[in-house]
């Protein structure tokens, strides 16, 4: 090939001798030149036509090499003309020629003539190259330009500019050689933000990059760096808060010149989240940290160190380290965070200690030194045995810095808990020394002189064999010697013996035949807080081992109350999770179950029901799954255990947080049976109500009509197959629409009341006619026989006032599990009986008999009967009768009211502060004994049956506490039926005090007001009553100002039907300000300090958000007005809102308004419509300017030139940033129905793009269907504007954004829809957008995966979408 080409091209450049002799004087005419070119190309054309396809590229490269080997500029010029003609006549492909030219090794800037001629040729033919080829050429050209040095002779600058002209042509917007979006990607790869472009390109490149700043802003959330989340315990995290784990930057889509602050590390965001108690799961989610992969995260390490330094600064200003003070809470939290992140190796202990030393050096911060050493001791004592001594030695460097004393530090008062912190450094030294001895290390660390007195005191205490619990000496010894088993056994032995009891004294527990070991006083929280994590782990391990041993030994004695209470308290420490709650759920429970130790199982379930706080949702759902499998085991078919299992399951189901339901149940989609009850209709109904509430509060179903394709479809279908049932219309009407549709489709035929009555009469006739006792017992207790026996007992009592002994025997034989079905039927039968009752005397008799069945004969417990009644699906009048029965059962006799009032009066919900719970518990049970084995009936039958049932130990529970989750359900049922409102008020008046013991009273109130917003809109008195009853029940146990604002308590709590209180702007500003101050960590904060470990909410911000929402929903003001008032806090000029902090206020409004029902936040859509219709966006003559300045909130705000459109834009972004995907999914509906018809101008179009552009990423990740609808709507809107405008000034930013959308989000998924729209646009737009659809027709090859993280698994309501095209294509 080479020889043929050689001869062809040498022939081309052959000249006569005379021409060479007079080279500068001979000149061809243009005609001669052309003739020569054509004749020369003829020979080549012939050769090219027979050349195989695969040799084309090699051939072109040889030609270029041949040309570049020439030395005569004239010859090169002639050959380049030949190449140009070959391209123009279609002989050679332009892309191949350009690539060969630019990639030639001979093309160097020093050969200026060749450089000029080459780039002129490229400029001439590049127009024929496809856009992908142009992109590749741009990349190589930019790299080639990089080879030009920073300093060159001015003589050659002109020649070098030929390359610049080619770049200018490629970047020329009107030429449209390639999407400008792809060009800027290449430019920014070579010259990222902050790096200057090559001097040859200078302003050309920087101006081009600047032209993309509007596109970058369209894709950015206003004030994003100031937006902060509220940390919840659920671990659920929205993609909005993800950060790069190496740089802490936001993961921005596409290479665009985003605002500088978006490229900065978001240390403030991570620091804020780290400061929040119970935030570790969110931190892991934000940074993508996985516990299974031990990966050090230096940025996290730095923030932890900074947080410790901040705590040291705080300690310097605080007068004293008081119990429950801000400083104590901060150090407590820091200790927990440090252990977690260092334990899972996300942070390195020695690195952190050295970094701390560096940051504290020369600062003189020593007031907090003991607390710092206490935090370090936590980790050292627990891990020094498994790690090298060298890892811990940097602590001694820190000691030298923080303990400069020359004299001995005196021994502190050891009756105070903080004395354990004062001893922390001495304890560290003892552990280090012990490690050095064990490792036979030559390195001996002498005791520092300043710690001598402390050390001597510990040595002396160790010699004292009779340690008392009156001071903190035991804790000190445990902390100092936890790695020295000889010394540790004594103090730990004292602690253990204190709570186990010595075995000589036994005490009775409630019920008959139940005795426990005699220790009743638990270890106080102050003492447990004073133990290191290592000591706590030893203690909890010892307790768990003891429990397992007792379970396996089938011990006749129950666990000591002190042990059970202490174990509960230890489970609150997140630092010991592996031995704590994880061991409890995955090791202890299964072992106890396997050993058939039903007493201990009952104890563990009681602990979980009444003593556990902030348990992660996956543990709770795991326990629920255990309970459902337990329910089917024959041994659990025992009255007390069955009641406990069902009661615990009910609590677990109803207590699930709205944001927890979907993530947790999605884990069981492959086998939903494990989290559902195979036989309990009530538990399955409770789960459906929880799903309805969760999907309503999170707006999961917003915009959906069906549950098809969603996570709850299989769950609902399995429930219907397990326990077929219907819902009353008044309950169903509150469900989200897709759930309503499901239950209407899956309607279950119900037995008529008439049939029920007939069957009961028939069975009763059988009862009266049968004479053989065994036959009667067999017939009525037979599995599969109609569950009507309680109806028969009722009839017996009505007719004869007594039940005979056979009745008792049948009940005993039926068994606890089967009896539930009888209670269900009995509930329906009662409604029938009361509905047909003549009233008066007969009604009183019915009520009396019903109460006797509960309190006198102990046939069914009150909580079980009320739950069954509340869960039936009666309609209309029958529903009212059902609720009437519930009210009578709860209030008519004094039995339950007395129990409630005495329990509320005598007890406190703050169990962690009590040491006499057991005494009060026993006193209550002596006064109101629980009878769970039909004892009353056994005594009353003739002849009486002597029974002494074996009770399982009861440590915490009673009928009042068991009734609380049932009461939650009862209130909801009463709210659904308007005619029974007054009855509900009466119930709240008499029993509302029970909410003092509710573990989540504010959450319950929040969920209730949110879910029933529509039902409560016009029932302001009932709303007020509900809030008053629940919040008022806690007044004696909460400090002033813990929940509702003073203004609301003063004006909102007073019923004024004629003239309801309408709050003013000041009220809303103060309410928002309270959340702003809380999130800013203001000290003292708006809310009183508390121990968050035992609080309903995990941290101050979560508490502030929920109480604020409760108060706003409780106002006697329509949701729409409240929503507008909240928006006005920043959209109107408010003297109480500081300008410099405006984004923090917008953040707070976003958090609050998105946590409220739809009527509150939907008003934002009206504000957007008002802005779009405002003169500044509809009339181009209204003002002369650049719309991107108008929409730049930050710049406008700083320049005091803000306009309502930029404020509304920033506020909308804050609201939508905090919105759930359900709330955001109204946008695709809002666009075509409301916005498209009104968008007529470019400014309006750009405003809508600015509004919605930043959220395309959320839609892509969480609901692709919505992203596709929005993508199409953007083009339809552009068509509208195009047809309504004579001139378009901002075509380039609009098109750049549409390309950004294509390459980063939609890919080819909307190609077909938008192709038709693009065809109808004006030529200039059509030219710019031609690559949007042209790209896929030109290349049939499938696109590679996106360069950013891929889209997650398809979510509900998603449709298949082609993978977004990457800008690397």
Swiss-Prot record:
<keyword id="KW-0805">Transcription regulation</keyword>
<dbReference type="GO" id="GO:0005667">
    <property type="term" value="C:transcription regulator complex"/>
</dbReference>
<dbReference type="GO" id="GO:0006357">
    <property type="term" value="P:regulation of transcription by RNA polymerase II"/>
</dbReference>
<dbReference type="GO" id="GO:0016592">
    <property type="term" value="C:mediator complex"/>
</dbReference>
<comment type="subunit">
    <text>Component of the Mediator complex.</text>
</comment>
<comment type="similarity">
    <text>Belongs to the Mediator complex subunit 23 family.</text>
</comment>
<keyword id="KW-0804">Transcription</keyword>
<dbReference type="InterPro" id="IPR021629">
    <property type="entry name" value="Mediator_Med23"/>
</dbReference>
<feature type="region of interest" description="Disordered">
    <location>
        <begin position="1337"/>
        <end position="1369"/>
    </location>
</feature>
<dbReference type="GO" id="GO:0010628">
    <property type="term" value="P:positive regulation of gene expression"/>
</dbReference>
<protein>
    <recommendedName>
        <fullName>Mediator of RNA polymerase II transcription subunit 23</fullName>
    </recommendedName>
</protein>
<comment type="function">
    <text>Component of the Mediator complex, a coactivator involved in the regulated transcription of nearly all RNA polymerase II-dependent genes. Mediator functions as a bridge to convey information from gene-specific regulatory proteins to the basal RNA polymerase II transcription machinery. Mediator is recruited to promoters by direct interactions with regulatory proteins and serves as a scaffold for the assembly of a functional preinitiation complex with RNA polymerase II and the general transcription factors.</text>
</comment>
<feature type="compositionally biased region" description="Pro residues">
    <location>
        <begin position="1341"/>
        <end position="1357"/>
    </location>
</feature>
<dbReference type="Pfam" id="PF11573">
    <property type="entry name" value="Med23"/>
</dbReference>
<keyword id="KW-0010">Activator</keyword>
<keyword id="KW-0539">Nucleus</keyword>
């Amino acid at each position: 090939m080479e020889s043929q080409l050689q001869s062809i091209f040498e022939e081309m450049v052959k000249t006569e001798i005379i021409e060479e002799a007079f080279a500068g004087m001979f000149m061809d005419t243009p005609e001669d030149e052309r003739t020569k070119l054509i004749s020369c190309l003829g020979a080549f054309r012939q050769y090219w036509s027979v050349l195989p396809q695969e040799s084309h590229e090699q051939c072109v490269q040889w030609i270029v090499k041949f040309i570049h080997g020439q030395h005569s500029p004239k010859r090169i010029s002639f050959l380049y003309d030949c190449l140009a003609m070959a391209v123009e006549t279609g002989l050679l492909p332009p892309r191949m020629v350009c690539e060969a030219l630019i990639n030639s090794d001979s093309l160097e800037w020093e050969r200026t003539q060749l450089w000029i001629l080459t780039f002129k040729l490229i400029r001439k033919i590049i127009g024929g190259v496809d856009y992908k080829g142009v992109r590749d050429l741009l990349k190589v050209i930019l790299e080639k330009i990089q080879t030009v040095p920073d300093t060159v002779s001015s003589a050659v600058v002109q020649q070098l500019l030929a390359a610049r002209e080619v770049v200018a042509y490629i970047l020329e917007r009107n030429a449209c050689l390639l999407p400008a979006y792809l060009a800027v990607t290449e430019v920014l790869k070579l010259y990222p933000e902050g790096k200057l472009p090559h001097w040859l390109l200078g302003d050309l490149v920087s101006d081009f990059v600047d032209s993309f700043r509007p596109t970058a802003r369209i894709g950015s959330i206003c004030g994003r760096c100031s937006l902060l989340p509220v940390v919840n315990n659920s671990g659920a995290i929205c993609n909005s808060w993800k950060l790069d784990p190496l740089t802490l930057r936001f993961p921005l889509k596409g290479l665009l010149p985003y605002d500088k602050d978006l490229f900065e590390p978001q240390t403030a965001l991570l620091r804020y989240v780290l400061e929040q108690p119970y935030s570790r799961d969110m931190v892991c989610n934000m940074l993508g940290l996985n516990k299974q992969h031990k990966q050090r995260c230096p940025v996290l390490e730095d923030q932890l160190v900074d947080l410790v330094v901040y705590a040291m600064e705080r300690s310097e200003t605080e007068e004293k380290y008081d119990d429950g003070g801000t400083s104590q809470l901060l150090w407590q939290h820091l200790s927990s965070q440090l252990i977690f992140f260092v334990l899972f190796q996300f942070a390195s202990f020695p690195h952190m200690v050295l970094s701390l030393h560096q940051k504290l050096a020369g600062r003189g911060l020593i007031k907090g030194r003991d607390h710092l050493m206490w935090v370090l001791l936590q980790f050292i004592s627990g891990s020094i045995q498994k790690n090298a001594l060298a890892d811990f030695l940097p602590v001694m460097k820190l000691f030298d810095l923080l303990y400069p004393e020359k004299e001995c530090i005196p021994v502190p008062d050891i009756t105070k808990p903080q004395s354990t912190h004062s001893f922390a450094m001495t304890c560290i030294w003892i552990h280090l020394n012990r490690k050095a001895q064990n490792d036979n290390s030559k390195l001996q660390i002498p005791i520092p002189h300043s710690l001598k007195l402390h050390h001597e005191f510990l040595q002396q205490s160790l010699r004292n064999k009779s340690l008392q619990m009156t001071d903190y000496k035991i804790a000190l010894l445990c902390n100092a010697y936890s790695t020295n088993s000889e010394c540790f056994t004594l103090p730990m032995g004292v602690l253990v013996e204190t709570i186990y009891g010595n075995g000589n004294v036994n005490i009775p527990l409630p019920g008959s035949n139940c005795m426990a070991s005699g220790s009743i006083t638990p270890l106080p929280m102050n003492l447990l807080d004073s133990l290191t994590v290592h000591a706590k782990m030893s203690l909890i391990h010892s307790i768990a081992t003891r429990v397992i041993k007792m379970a396996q030994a089938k011990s006749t004695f129950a666990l000591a109350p002190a042990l059970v209470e202490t174990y509960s308290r230890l489970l609150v420490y997140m630092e010991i999770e592996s031995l704590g709650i994880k061991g409890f759920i995955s090791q202890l429970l299964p072992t106890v179950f396997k050993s058939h130790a039903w007493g201990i199982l009952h104890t563990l379930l009681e602990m979980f029901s009444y003593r556990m706080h902030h348990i992660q949702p996956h543990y709770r759902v795991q326990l629920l799954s255990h309970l459902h499998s337990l329910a089917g085991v024959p041994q659990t078919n025992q009255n007390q255990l069955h009641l406990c299992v069902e009661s615990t399951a009910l609590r677990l189901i109803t207590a699930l947080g709205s944001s927890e339901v979907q993530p947790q149940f999605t884990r069981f989609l492959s086998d939903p049976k494990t989290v559902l009850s195979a036989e309990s209709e009530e538990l399955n109904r409770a789960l459906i109500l929880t799903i309805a509430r969760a999907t309503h509060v999170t707006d999961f179903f917003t915009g959906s009509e069906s549950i098809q394709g969603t996570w709850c479809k299989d769950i609902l279908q399995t429930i219907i197959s397990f326990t077929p049932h219907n819902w009353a219309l008044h309950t169903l009407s509150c469900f989200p629409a897709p759930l309503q549709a499901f239950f209407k489709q899956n309607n279950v035929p119900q037995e008529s009341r008439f049939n029920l009555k007939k069957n009961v009469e028939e069975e009763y006739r059988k009862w009266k006619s049968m004479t053989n006792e065994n036959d009667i017992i067999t017939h009525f207790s037979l599995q599969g026989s109609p569950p009507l026996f309680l109806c028969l007992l009722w009839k017996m009592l009505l007719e004869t006032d007594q039940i005979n002994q056979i009745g008792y025997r049948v009940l005993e034989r039926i068994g606890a599990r089967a009896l539930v079905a009888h209670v269900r039927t009995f509930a329906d039968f009662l409604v029938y009986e009361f509905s047909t009752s003549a009233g008066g005397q007969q009604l009183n008799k019915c009520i009396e008999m019903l109460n006797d069945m509960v309190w006198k004969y102990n046939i069914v417990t009150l909580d079980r009967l009320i739950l069954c009644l509340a869960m039936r699906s009666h309609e209309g009048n029958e529903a009212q009768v059902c609720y009437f029965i519930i009210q009578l059962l709860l209030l008519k006799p004094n039995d339950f009211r007395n129990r409630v009032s005495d329990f509320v009066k005598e007890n406190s919900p703050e169990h962690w502060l009590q040491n006499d719970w057991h005494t009060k518990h026993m006193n209550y049970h002596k006064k109101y004994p629980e009878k769970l084995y039909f004892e009353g009936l056994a005594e009353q039958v003739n002849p009486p049956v002597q029974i002494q049932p074996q009770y399982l130990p009861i440590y915490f529970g009673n009928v009042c506490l068991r009734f609380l989750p049932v009461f939650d359900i009862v209130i909801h049922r009463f709210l659904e039926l308007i005619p029974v409102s007054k009855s509900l008020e009466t119930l709240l008046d008499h029993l509302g005090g029970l909410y003092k013991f509710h573990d989540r009273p504010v959450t319950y109130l929040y969920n209730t007001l949110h879910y029933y917003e529509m039902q409560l809109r016009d029932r302001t008195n009932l709303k007020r009553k509900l809030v008053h009853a629940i919040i008022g029940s806690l007044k004696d146990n909460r400090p002033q100002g813990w929940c509702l604002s003073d203004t609301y308590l003063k004006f909102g709590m007073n019923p004024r039907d004629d003239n309801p209180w309408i709050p003013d702007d000041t009220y809303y500003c103060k309410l928002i300000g309270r959340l702003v101050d809380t999130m800013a960590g203001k000290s003292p904060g708006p809310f009183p300090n508390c121990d968050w470990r035992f609080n309903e909410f995990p941290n101050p911000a979560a508490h502030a958000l929920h109480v604020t929402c409760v108060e706003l929903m409780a106002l006697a003001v329509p949701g729409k007005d409240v929503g507008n008032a909240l928006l006005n806090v920043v959209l109107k000029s408010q003297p109480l809102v500081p300008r410099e902090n405006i984004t923090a206020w917008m953040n707070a409004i976003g958090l609050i308004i998105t946590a409220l029902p739809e009527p509150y936040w939907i008003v934002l859509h009206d504000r957007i419509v008002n802005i779009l219709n405002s003169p500044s966006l509809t009339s181009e003559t209204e003002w002369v300017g650049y719309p991107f300045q108008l929409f730049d909130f930050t710049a406008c705000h700083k320049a005091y030139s803000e306009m309502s459109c930029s404020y509304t834009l920033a506020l909308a972004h804050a609201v939508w940033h905090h919105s759930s995907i359900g709330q955001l999914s109204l946008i695709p509906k809002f666009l075509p129905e409301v916005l498209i018809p009104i968008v007529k101008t470019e400014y309006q179009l750009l405003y809508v793009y600015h509004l919605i552009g930043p959220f395309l990423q959320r839609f892509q990740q969480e609901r692709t269907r919505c992203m596709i609808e929005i993508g199409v709507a953007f083009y339809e809107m552009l068509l509208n504007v195009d047809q309504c405008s004579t001139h378009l000034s901002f075509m380039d930013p609009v098109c750049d954004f549409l390309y950004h959308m294509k390459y980063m989000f939609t890919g080819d998924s909307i190609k077909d829809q938008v192709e038709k729209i693009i065809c109808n646009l004006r030529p200039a737009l059509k030219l710019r957008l031609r690559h949007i659809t042209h790209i896929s027709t030109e290349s049939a090859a499938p696109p590679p995966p996106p360069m950013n993280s891929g889209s997650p698994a398809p979510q509900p309501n998603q449709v298949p979408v082609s993978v977004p095209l990457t800008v690397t294509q």
